[in-house]
Protein backbone atom coordinates (compact mmCIF):
# COMPACT_ATOMS: atom_id res chain seq x y z
CA UNK A 1 0.00 0.00 0.00
CA UNK A 2 1.46 3.35 -1.03
CA UNK A 3 1.59 6.25 1.40
CA UNK A 4 2.43 8.77 -1.32
CA UNK A 5 0.33 11.91 -1.51
CA UNK A 6 -0.97 12.18 -5.07
CA UNK A 7 -3.42 15.08 -4.87
CA UNK A 8 -3.43 18.67 -3.67
CA UNK A 9 -2.92 18.44 0.08
CA UNK A 10 -2.31 20.71 3.04
CA UNK A 11 -0.39 18.65 5.60
CA UNK A 12 0.14 20.53 8.84
CA UNK A 13 1.98 19.38 11.95
CA UNK A 14 0.96 20.69 15.35
CA UNK A 15 2.76 20.11 18.68
CA UNK A 16 -0.01 18.80 20.95
CA UNK A 17 -3.75 18.16 20.76
CA UNK A 18 -6.03 20.18 23.05
CA UNK A 19 -3.45 22.92 23.72
CA UNK A 20 -4.44 26.55 23.05
CA UNK A 21 -2.34 27.24 19.93
CA UNK A 22 -3.13 23.89 18.35
CA UNK A 23 -6.83 24.34 19.06
CA UNK A 24 -6.79 27.71 17.30
CA UNK A 25 -4.91 26.21 14.34
CA UNK A 26 -7.22 23.22 13.79
CA UNK A 27 -10.26 25.48 14.08
CA UNK A 28 -8.82 27.98 11.58
CA UNK A 29 -8.35 25.17 9.06
CA UNK A 30 -11.89 24.01 9.91
CA UNK A 31 -13.33 27.51 9.37
CA UNK A 32 -11.71 27.62 5.94
CA UNK A 33 -12.40 23.98 5.04
CA UNK A 34 -14.89 24.80 2.25
CA UNK A 35 -12.51 27.34 0.68
CA UNK A 36 -9.72 24.76 0.56
CA UNK A 37 -12.15 22.17 -0.79
CA UNK A 38 -13.18 24.52 -3.63
CA UNK A 39 -9.49 24.69 -4.55
CA UNK A 40 -9.42 20.83 -4.57
CA UNK A 41 -7.28 20.52 -1.43
CA UNK A 42 -7.39 17.75 1.13
CA UNK A 43 -6.42 18.87 4.64
CA UNK A 44 -4.58 16.59 7.05
CA UNK A 45 -3.34 17.57 10.50
CA UNK A 46 -0.72 15.49 12.29
CA UNK A 47 0.92 15.33 15.73
CA UNK A 48 2.77 12.86 17.95
CA UNK A 49 -0.36 12.46 20.09
CA UNK A 50 -1.92 9.02 20.43
CA UNK A 51 -4.60 8.01 17.95
CA UNK A 52 -7.14 8.15 20.79
CA UNK A 53 -6.20 11.74 21.71
CA UNK A 54 -6.42 12.87 18.09
CA UNK A 55 -9.83 11.22 17.73
CA UNK A 56 -11.04 13.07 20.85
CA UNK A 57 -9.55 16.33 19.51
CA UNK A 58 -11.27 15.90 16.12
CA UNK A 59 -14.59 14.96 17.72
CA UNK A 60 -14.51 17.81 20.23
CA UNK A 61 -14.22 20.39 17.45
CA UNK A 62 -16.25 18.43 14.86
CA UNK A 63 -13.41 18.60 12.35
CA UNK A 64 -14.31 17.74 8.77
CA UNK A 65 -10.77 16.68 7.90
CA UNK A 66 -8.42 13.97 9.17
CA UNK A 67 -5.98 14.17 12.05
CA UNK A 68 -3.15 11.67 12.01
CA UNK A 69 -0.81 10.39 14.69
CA UNK A 70 2.86 10.24 13.73
CA UNK A 71 3.70 6.76 14.96
CA UNK A 72 6.58 6.23 12.49
CA UNK A 73 8.66 9.37 13.16
CA UNK A 74 7.74 11.20 9.96
CA UNK A 75 8.46 14.41 11.92
CA UNK A 76 12.06 13.36 12.38
CA UNK A 77 12.40 12.45 8.69
CA UNK A 78 11.03 15.88 7.72
CA UNK A 79 13.42 17.65 10.11
CA UNK A 80 10.63 19.12 12.22
CA UNK A 81 11.30 17.12 15.42
CA UNK A 82 13.41 19.71 17.21
CA UNK A 83 14.83 20.54 20.60
CA UNK A 84 12.72 23.09 22.44
CA UNK A 85 12.96 24.84 25.77
CA UNK A 86 10.25 25.91 28.21
CA UNK A 87 10.95 27.40 31.62
CA UNK A 88 14.58 26.33 31.26
CA UNK A 89 13.65 22.69 30.62
CA UNK A 90 14.83 21.22 27.32
CA UNK A 91 12.75 18.65 25.47
CA UNK A 92 11.99 17.49 21.92
CA UNK A 93 8.81 18.39 20.11
CA UNK A 94 7.27 19.27 16.79
CA UNK A 95 8.24 22.50 15.04
CA UNK A 96 4.77 23.69 13.99
CA UNK A 97 4.98 23.30 10.20
CA UNK A 98 2.77 23.20 7.11
CA UNK A 99 3.45 21.52 3.78
CA UNK A 100 1.50 22.29 0.61
CA UNK A 101 1.57 19.48 -1.93
CA UNK A 102 0.54 20.14 -5.54
CA UNK A 103 -1.65 17.98 -7.80
CA UNK A 104 1.39 15.98 -8.95
CA UNK A 105 2.42 15.12 -5.39
CA UNK A 106 5.32 17.59 -5.33
CA UNK A 107 6.10 19.99 -2.50
CA UNK A 108 4.82 23.43 -3.56
CA UNK A 109 5.41 25.41 -0.35
CA UNK A 110 6.69 24.72 3.16
CA UNK A 111 6.28 26.78 6.32
CA UNK A 112 8.36 26.12 9.45
CA UNK A 113 8.25 27.76 12.88
CA UNK A 114 4.65 28.69 12.12
CA UNK A 115 2.97 31.39 14.17
CA UNK A 116 -0.72 30.53 14.40
CA UNK A 117 -2.07 34.07 13.93
CA UNK A 118 -2.98 34.63 10.25
CA UNK A 119 -1.18 31.44 9.15
CA UNK A 120 -4.22 29.73 7.63
CA UNK A 121 -5.13 32.95 5.80
CA UNK A 122 -1.63 32.99 4.25
CA UNK A 123 -1.84 29.28 3.33
CA UNK A 124 -5.19 29.88 1.63
CA UNK A 125 -3.76 32.78 -0.42
CA UNK A 126 -0.81 30.65 -1.61
CA UNK A 127 -3.17 27.73 -2.31
CA UNK A 128 -4.92 29.81 -4.98
CA UNK A 129 -1.74 29.60 -7.09
CA UNK A 130 -0.92 25.94 -6.48
CA UNK A 131 -1.22 23.77 -9.61
Each language-model region and where it sits:
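Chalcogenol-based redox active-site neighborhoods
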Residues: 1-131
